[in-house]
């Protein structure tokens, strides 16, 4: 029986996502023996500083990529929003699975919406993108960094450390925690991170056997949308250091891409959106990035450099 080893982070959410990928692979190839290889990454271990301060989201990938290079794993499963815009050779995105809910969720044990939070309420999130949008809609809020796994973050909310926190809807759904969502923060008013809600599988470019297996998981509409989002982010030189949001969706006759660049300090948001054919995501991403730059995003990006 052929064997396929999936490198994954040890967190409950990462394991759930990897188990889902494994189940899909077993459905596609019933004779395939799929096993998970759980690993700890530096991004999971260093929790007292922001991702921007310790090197960015790529810290969630490094150990998993090394496992593939050593021959200890055949592929790795990630939340696509955590995958850097450019994968260094010899790695590739072999599959992007059908997207789950791309929205963020406001979670509070007392207040029912962002608008109902009292003046000066304490809201926690580690994402600069979320902080910038919170600052735009509610400049009075007190914002705090919050890292750790989903249950750790929820525990801090439940202990009274904060009045509300913001997490990704998709992660909560995959953990069976939909009931904790107080309000969805969703497009078009609120934009997610590029690729948010999608699961990606990374493999070695040279491994044609694994690439062929994983290609059966790929969802073309999702891939086309996230290509547009990630191309926009790449053209802006975006990273976890920069508050960038993007969301592409299918509409009548084409694809629509909405993008934003924000500033946490003063809550400024620069927005742009364009439409194109569904197979022109790369061109659409570059065009929206240029619109953002022309509208003043260059100033905000320079301030974060």
UniProtKB/Swiss-Prot annotation:
Instruction: State the protein's name.
Output: Porphobilinogen deaminase
Q: What is its EC number?
A: 2.5.1.61
BP GO terms, sorted: protoporphyrinogen IX biosynthetic process
The record's GO molecular-function terms, alphabetically, read: hydroxymethylbilane synthase activity
The answer on whether this UniProt entry bears the keyword Lipid metabolism reads no
List cofactor names only: dipyrromethane
Source domain of life is: Bacteria
**Function field:** Tetrapolymerization of the monopyrrole PBG into the hydroxymethylbilane pre-uroporphyrinogen in several discrete steps.
> Which chemical reaction does it catalyze?
4 porphobilinogen + H2O = hydroxymethylbilane + 4 NH4(+)
Q: Which GO terms describe its cellular component?
A: cytoplasm
Subunit organization: Monomer.
The set of disulfide-linked cysteines is: none
Q: Which controlled-vocabulary keywords does the entry list?
A: Porphyrin biosynthesis, Transferase
Q: Which residues carry this modification: S-(dipyrrolylmethanemethyl)cysteine?
A: 240
SUPFAM superfamilies annotated for this entry?
Answer: Periplasmic binding protein-like II (SSF53850), Porphobilinogen deaminase (hydroxymethylbilane synthase), C-terminal domain (SSF54782)
Other comments on record:
The porphobilinogen subunits are added to the dipyrromethane group.
Gene, per the UniProt record: hemC
């Amino acid at each position: 029986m052929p064997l396929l080893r999936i490198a994954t982070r040890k967190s409950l959410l990462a394991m759930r996502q990897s188990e889902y990928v494994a189940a899909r692979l077993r459905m596609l190839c019933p004779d395939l023996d799929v096993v998970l290889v759980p690993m700890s990454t530096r991004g999971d271990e260093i929790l007292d500083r922001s991702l921007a301060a310790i090197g960015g989201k790529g810290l969630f990938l490094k150990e998993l990529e090394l496992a593939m290079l050593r021959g200890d794993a055949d592929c790795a499963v990630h939340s696509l929003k955590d995958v850097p815009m450019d994968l260094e050779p010899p790695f590739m995105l072999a599959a992007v699975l059908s997207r789950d809910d791309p929205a963020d969720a406001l979670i509070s044990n007392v207040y029912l919406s962002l608008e109902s939070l009292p003046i000066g309420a304490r809201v926690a999130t580690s994402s600069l993108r979320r902080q910038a949008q919170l600052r735009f809609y509610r400049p009075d809020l007190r914002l705090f960094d919050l890292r750790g796994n989903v249950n750790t973050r929820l525990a801090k909310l439940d202990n009274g450390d904060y009045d509300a926190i913001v997490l990704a809807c998709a992660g909560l759904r995959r953990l069976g925690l939909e009931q904790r969502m107080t309000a969805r923060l969703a497009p078009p008013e609120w934009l997610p991170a590029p690729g948010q809600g999608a699961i990606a599988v990374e493999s070695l470019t040279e491994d044609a056997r694994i690439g062929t297996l994983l290609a059966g998981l790929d969802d073309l509409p999702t891939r086309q949308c996230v290509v547009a989002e990630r191309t926009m982010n790449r053209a802006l030189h975006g990273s976890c250091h920069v508050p960038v949001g993007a969301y592409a969706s299918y509409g009548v006759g084409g694809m629509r891409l909405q993008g934003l660049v924000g500033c946490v300090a003063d809550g400024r948001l620069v927005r742009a959106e364009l439409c194109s054919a569904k197979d022109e995501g790369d061109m659409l991403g570059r065009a929206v990035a240029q619109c953002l730059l022309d509208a003043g995003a260059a100033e905000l990006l320079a301030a974060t450099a």
